[in-house]
C-alpha cells in the first residue's frame, strides 16, 4: 500500500449528498476481486450517457477538463452510504483519488477507505461549503492535505484541521494494510510456529 504523507492535488467537486456505493461503482461491475480496473466504471451512471460507457456525459463534473488529473474529491454529507462493497474505494483509488473531503461518511465505507490507503477527511459543513466556493471559482485550484499535521490548506492559504485515529494515521503514513501489519510480525510468528511444532507436532502433519 502506498504511504500517505502530504498530498498536493487538484480537487474535483461532486456536489451531491448521500452518494451511495451503487453510484460509486454499480453492482454489474463487481465481477472480480483484483483491486485494479474499476476506475473506468467509477460513477458510471453519471459519467456516461450509455450503458456501454462509450459516451461521456458532458454535464457531469468529473468529465470537465478542469478536473482532469484530480486526486482529491470534495463532496457532501453521508458519502459512501448504501450496501457494503470494498470495490467502492478501489474504484476511487483506481481513478486517481487519494483523499476525499466531506462533512460525513457512511461508517463501513469510511473504514474501508483507511484499509485501502485512502484518507477520508471530515470537515465541518461550513468549511466544506467554503472550499466548494474557493474551488469552483478557481480553475485548477489545488488543496494540500498534510496527514502528519492533520491539516487541509485551501487555495487561499486558509488552513483547516481534521481529526484522525492515531492507529489509522500510523498505517496510512507507513503504507500498511492488514497484510503489511501482519508481515511486520513475521519473526514473532516464526517463533510461535517453531514452539508450536515442538509441543503440538500433529498440527503440522500433512
From Swiss-Prot:
The keyword S-adenosyl-L-methionine does not apply. The gene is leuD. Pathway: Amino-acid biosynthesis; L-leucine biosynthesis; L-leucine from 3-methyl-2-oxobutanoate: step 2/4. Catalyzes the isomerization between 2-isopropylmalate and 3-isopropylmalate, via the formation of 2-isopropylmaleate. Its EC number is 4.2.1.33. This is 3-isopropylmalate dehydratase small subunit. Signal peptide: none annotated. InterPro entries: 3-IsopropMal_deHydase_ssu, Aconitase/3IPM_dehydase_swvl, AconitaseA/IPMdHydase_ssu_swvl, IPMI_Swivel, LeuD. The keyword Amino-acid biosynthesis applies.
